[in-house]
Swiss-Prot record:
May also have succinyldiaminopimelate aminotransferase activity, thus carrying out the corresponding step in lysine biosynthesis. This is Acetylornithine aminotransferase. It comes from Neisseria meningitidis serogroup A / serotype 4A (strain DSM 15465 / Z2491). Homodimer. SUPFAM superfamilies: PLP-dependent transferases (SSF53383). Its EC number is 2.6.1.11. The gene is argD. Binds 1 pyridoxal phosphate per subunit. The keyword Hydrolase does not apply. PANTHER family: AMINOTRANSFERASE CLASS III, SUCCINYLORNITHINE TRANSAMINASE.
Length: 397
C-alpha cells in the first residue's frame, strides 16, 4: 500500500483491518493477540458491543454543536468523573497532550491570579512523558523528543524520578506546580514510590503549589483502581486523563477542584472539539463498564496471572528477571545482555501473532484490554514463549 502520511511514524509491516475483543486481523487475514491495547487505549478491547451501540445511538442525534453550548453526553460523563474522583470540575479536550496542556496552563494561571507573576516554575521528572505539544514536550523530561524544537518554553525544572532529596531541593516558593506520572510509562513502566508521591503532596502544600498527576496512561482502570492515585493515599489538585477514557474514540479530560478550576474563566482556554457529543457518549458508556467492580477485579486477577507468567517466561528464557507495574500495565525489564533490544523482540512477536510494545529501549510493555480473559492470555503467552525462546537461542551471550 502506498504511504501518503508524513514520515514521523515507523509503521509496522502489517496493516490491521478489523478487530474484536483482544484479537486483531490484518489485511492478509492473519490473527494477532493484542497485548498492547493501542498503547493503553482499548481498555475494553476492540469494538465492544456496548460502545458500538452508544456511538450508533449518539450519531443519529448530534455530532457537533460548538462550545457555545453544553450537551447532555458531556455533562453526564463529567458528572461520573466528578462523582468518582477528588475533582469538582472537568475540562474536555481531544488527547492526553491537550489534557496536560490544560493542566499546566491552569496551574500557571491559578498561581498568577493568586500570588502574582513570580510564581510560575513547574517541577517535572526526568524521563517523564506528558505529550507532544511544545509546552508538554518541554515539561516531559526526555530531550530526544524536544531537542529539535528550540527555543523551548522556560520555567521548567527536571528532577530524577523517585529522588526525594532532589524533589525537596527543587520545590520552593517560585513553584506553581509539580507534575508526576504515578507510573512512568514511556520510560519503562516505573512506578512512583508511595513516599515520593506523599512527599510531593506535602511540598506542594507547604509552598502553595499544585500537584498535577498525569494519569493519561495509568487512569481508567489499568492499575486495578479507577485512578492510580488511589493506591498511594495521595489526592492531587489537578489530574489529566485520556487514552482509555474513550476506549479508542479520541477524548481527553482535565479534572480539578472547584477553587482551582475557577481560574479558567470564559475565553482563558478552550477546545473546538472538546466535549464532543459522540466522544462523551462513548466515554460515558465505557466509564460504566470500566468502573464496575467486576472489571476492576478482573484487572487485578488477570494482571497477577500475567505478571507471574511473564516472570516465569523471563526466567525460563533468561531474557528478563523483573516485571514492573500494576494491574494490566506491566513492563518486562530486559537483563543486561539484551538491553537496547526491546524493539527487536516486539518485531519478532508481531511476526508470530502477538502485539506487544516497548517502553524505552530496555522494556517490553503490556497494556491489554481490562477484559482480558484466560483463553486470550494463554494463547498470547503461548505465542510469546515461542518468540522469546527463539530470540534467546539466537542471541545467547
Amino acid at each position: 500500500m502506498q504511504n501518503y502520511l508524513t514520515p514521523n511514524f515507523a509503521f509496522a509491516p502489517m496493516i490491521p483491518e478489523r478487530a474484536s475483543g483482544s484479537r486483531v486481523w490484518d489485511t492478509e487475514g492473519r490473527e494477532y493477540i493484542d497485548f498492547s491495547g493501542g498503547i493503553a487505549v482499548n481498555a475494553l478491547g476492540h469494538c465492544h458491543p456496548a460502545l458500538v451501540d452508544a456511538l450508533n445511538a449518539q450519531m443519529h442525534k448530534l455530532w457537533h454543536i460548538s462550545n457555545i453550548y453544553t450537551t447532555r453526553p458531556a455533562q453526564e460523563l463529567a458528572q461520573k468523573l466528578v462523582a468518582n474522583s477528588f475533582a469538582d470540575k472537568v475540562f474536555f479536550c481531544n488527547s492526553g497532550s491537550e489534557a496536560n496542556e490544560a493542566a499546566l496552563k491552569l496551574a500557571r494561571k491559578y498561581a498568577r491570579d493568586r500570588f502574582g507573576g513570580g510564581k510560575s516554575e513547574i517541577v517535572a521528572c526526568i524521563n517523564s512523558f506528558h505529550g507532544r505539544t511544545l509546552f508538554t514536550v518541554s515539561v516531559g523530561g526526555q530531550p530526544k523528543y524536544s531537542k529539535d524544537y528550540a527555543p523551548l518554553p522556560q520555567g521548567i525544572t527536571h528532577v530524577p524520578f523517585n529522588d526525594i532529596a532532589a524533589l525537596e531541593a527543587a520545590v520552593g516558593e517560585q513553584t506553581c506546580a509539580v507534575i508526576i506520572e504515578p507510573i512512568q510509562g514511556e520510560s519503562g513502566i516505573l512506578p512512583a514510590t508511595a513516599e515520593y508521591l506523599q512527599t510531593a503532596r506535602r511540598l506542594c502544600d507547604r509552598h502553595n503549589a499544585l500537584l498535577i498527576l498525569d494519569e493519561v496512561q495509568t487512569g481508567m482502570g489499568h492499575t486495578g483502581r479507577l485512578f492510580a492515585y488511589e493506591h498511594y493515599g495521595v489526592v492531587p489538585d489537578i489530574l489529566s486523563s485520556a487514552k482509555a477514557l474513550g476506549c479508542g474514540f479520541p477524548i481527553g479530560a482535565m479534572l480539578a477542584t472547584e477553587t482551582i478550576a475557577a481560574a479558567f474563566q470564559p475565553g482563558t482556554h478552550g477546545s473546538t472539539f472538546g466535549g464532543n457529543p459522540m466522544a462523551c457518549a462513548v466515554g460515558s458508556r465505557a466509564f460504566d463498564i470500566i468502573n464496575a467492580p467486576e472489571t476492576l477485579h478482573n484487572v487485578r486477577s488477570q494482571g497477577q496471572k500475567l505478571q507471574t507468567a511473564l516472570l516465569d517466561l523471563g526466567r525460563k528464557t533468561g531474557l528478563f528477571s523483573q516485571v514492573r507495574g500494576m494491574g494490566l500495565l506491566l513492563g518486562c525489564v530486559l537483563d543486561a545482555p539484551y538491553r537496547g533490544r526491546a524493539s527487536e523482540i516486539t518485531a519478532a512477536a508481531l511476526k508470530h501473532g502477538v502485539m506487544i510494545l516497548v517502553a524505552g529501549a530496555d522494556v517490553l510493555r503490556f497494556a491489554p484490554s481490562l477484559l482480558l480473559n484466560d483463553e486470550d492470555t494463554a494463547e498470547g503467552l503461548r505465542r510469546l514463549e515461542h518468540v522469546l525462546t527463539e530470540f534467546a537461542a539466537a542471541n545467547r551471550p
